[in-house]
Amino acid sequence: MSLRHIIVLVDPNHSQQATPAINRASQLAATSGAAVQLLSIAYRSELDSSHLFDLTDLEKLRESFCSKKVAELNELASPAIKQGIHVSSACLWGRDWVDVLLTHLGSTPCDLLIKATHKTGAIKRFLFGGSDWQLIRRCPVPLWLVREGDWHAGKLVAAVDPLHSQEGYAGLDRKLMHWAARLHELLNMEEHYLHAFMPLPRTLVFDAELVADYDGYARRCQLQHREAFEKLVSQRPVPLPQTHLLQGYTEDVLPAFIEQQSIDLLLIGAVSRGQLDTALLGHTAERVLDQVDCELLILKPDGFGQDSSKP
């Protein structure tokens, strides 16, 4: 897994809130040697069109506005630069920041995108707006969502699904494991791997043979998942206590596990929906992302979003 180029997305209206994201990029760059770009995407409606200025004057005003934002980014970059990290700054202009960003990612090397998020106060949840969900679904590169407050590079968990029916998910599981291993190397994080499964509930079993031996069916289901999970995690020299096969619905099991184990980072995959370039997160995954109290690293299958600039 290559980590040479990191982009940190900075809200031009709240640039100081990007400090945790910049810190995370600095941690990774310090050990990987990656170059970091601080990127803002600015827009002011009054500079988009005006009867008072011609197009040339408007363009100059936008350039001036973006130059001020770049100066702010340079100031934010100063601590990292003093650490010897290569940091550049850029400001792009556009009404829809997600589309502008995805176009930029299509022409700029990027191995990891980092974005700060906000939480809804005492209930400790991420606060995702509509544009955030667009980015989560459409971003073609690994996306690290950073939370406010102190963060310790202690434990990570990769949520894998070795029996997923979606084509290409096996490669995504391997990608999750590669990233987990790399973060262990770079940040000395303790790796954990988790697979949650749930047999078909008894109330939904209509086959007479299965109804008669539901307990046997449940045991066979557990064995099938255990064998597939053990085969997958055998690719990594991880102690058995750091592998977790849990029975239950993922949206219930995963947030509870993260809280009980004091997990600092969740690695989770998002699969593509047929030929579309958006990610099929689904109700389950969206509930997980909305409930977990840790930072998130969301990965897509290789080849995802070849034309991700389109909705």
Regions found by a protein language model. Give the residues of each.
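Glycine-rich, Arg-bearing micro-motifs that act as flexible, cationic patches
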Residues: K115-Q134, L265-Q291
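Active-site-adjacent scaffolding segments
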Residues: T108, L112-F126, C139-W144
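Structural beta-alpha unit
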Residues: M1-S2, Q16, E75-L113, V233-L266, ...
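Short, acidic/small-residue loops that bind anionic groups at enzyme active sites
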Residues: Q134-E148, Q291-L299
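A short acidic, glycine-rich active-site loop
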Residues: D57-A71, D213-E227
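Small/aliphatic-rich secondary-structure junction motif
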Residues: M1-D57, K155-V211, Q291, P301, ...
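General small-molecule cofactor/ligand-binding pocket signal
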Residues: Q37-L39, S88-L92, W144, H192-L194, ...
